[in-house]
Amino acid sequence: MTVTLSGFADEISPDLDEQLATLTAESVAHLELRSAWSVGVADLSDAHVGRIASALGEAGVRVSAIGSPIGKIPVQAPLGPELDRLRRVAEIGGRLGTPIIRVFSFFIPAGEPPGRYREQVIDRMGALATVAEKHGAILAHENEKEIYGDVPQRCADLIESVYSPALRATFDAANFVQCGVRPHSDAYPLLRRHLVYVQIKDALADTGEVVPAGEGDGEVRETLAALRDSGFEGYLSLEPHLAEAGPFGGFSGPAEFRRAAQALQALLAELQIPWR
């Protein structure tokens, strides 16, 4: 088993050159593209994408996934514009060499039971998956707070109900902690067979504060060991959120991003997990 390290490089800096310099200094040869020059990935122009491709080639860095915001809208919002945005980010992913696109399963109205929206969410995610299939893309659904798929049971039910090869799961331990879920004990058994991608961030259960991997209650060490034992060979993507965290992204800065990368690399060394 060998895992591949990546990260949300816009947590380092809005500037792509500084992002790439910090990644390469920490021997991280992939990035998850969420934004560059403070432009969100779904809004990047063809000229932007060309500049990104050139900079990546010069730095020897590749794109592991598109960190899109697709599905981070209210469940009652019109779906058409979201399908158009997905087509655009799938095109960008194709140009940059990755089929993987992070997505979400829609914000549920505050105070309402998520189950009330189950069929609507399944229909919407099925429509996204159909677009992804046509573009040769793989949607990696992230468990995010306050969306339909925020707890493992709904994540698994969603993926199994849509039943498309284009809809898989990404695993975010910190988000599970912030939803009162034990990531390895409760979520991993339900989601392992659906996992195509793993986000690396940890959190404290009592406050929800995000901390480097292994320093919180996210059972990151246990999850990495289980992934090792199962032969997982996918991406581990750093999303540190060590300086700022919000519903549409986070920020760490170069020094804190390096601290997060080194914490993950130390865990991998402890667990004897090869990485590249």
Spans of model-derived segments:
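N-terminal small/glycine-rich loop or linker at the start of catalytic domains
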Residues: 1-6, 63-73, 105-108
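Active-site-proximal loop/turn and secondary-structure-junction residues that shape catalytic pockets
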Residues: 11-13, 35-37, 69-72, 105-109, ...
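A short, structure-level motif marking secondary-structure boundaries and short turns
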Residues: 3-6, 36-39, 73-76, 112-114, ...
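Active-site acidic/histidine proton-transfer and metal-coordination neighborhood
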Residues: 14-21, 55-58, 75-169, 178, ...
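Conserved beta-strand positions in the central sheet of alpha/beta enzyme cores
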Residues: 32, 65-67, 102, 140, ...
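Short, solvent-exposed loop/turn segments at secondary-structure boundaries
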Residues: 42-46, 75-80, 112-117, 180-183, ...
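Glycine-rich, proline-tolerant flexible connector loops at the mouths of alpha/beta enzymes
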Residues: 33-53, 106-112
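Histidine-acidic metal/acid-base catalytic patches
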Residues: 1-29, 53, 57-60, 97, ...
